[in-house]
């Protein structure tokens, strides 16, 4: 969704809500979208899910520029919330015009990382690299795993991109909820095997948007992501719109620190045959270090590849 003149707005069941491709400032009844192909990709009877499925609307009419819907599940809508079309074959490029403009701007101001949304296959990174080459600057590109097509092409995506993010919010809209934990574990396992960083994101401490302490289930969720072997856990709404942004960061850091201190030995060993010389050397180095009870592991690296391959082994010996 685009921006609203005011808001957020609460949509009641039965309300008419229109989405237009025209560039306007939205009201409770009509708002713009950056996805210009939306009217062509939907038809009456299709369902649109807004803000990770918190609001559900049914398409009643689609013209050249406006999609008219009826609210089925009530909720708030506000600036820049995502729209999902589960089961609809969306004809949209990996990068919209705005995405390309934003990418160029990010490169010019010195962004360290770029995350690409709604990746479907390994080819989606090509346009990003083309623009980076035009701008004369390449930085790592993270593939956000949030579409069923991405799950189907997971290994080739991990191979093509520099890192992946398991974006569980959109995944839980596009896939059955019960499938998300398995996809998360599968993605983390594949990324570790291929020595690519993997981030677990979305709704990790969601209740802290409004509360100063998390639920016990959320605490376990963060810890389990660490125990799965994830390289990073990420906050989103908790810090962008939440009431307790500092407390939520401190809370997540405490959970991660405690899990790493007491649970590193619970992370499943990486039972793979190394594919590269760097992989073989780092695996051998960890075995030797454990055998001689070394105090530290020193890693000499220029590209960072050896450090990543050493990190994925999750040794309890500190690394320099």
Describe the residue ranges of each PLM region.
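Non-catalytic helical/linker scaffolds that mediate oligomerization, partner binding
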Residues: 1-320
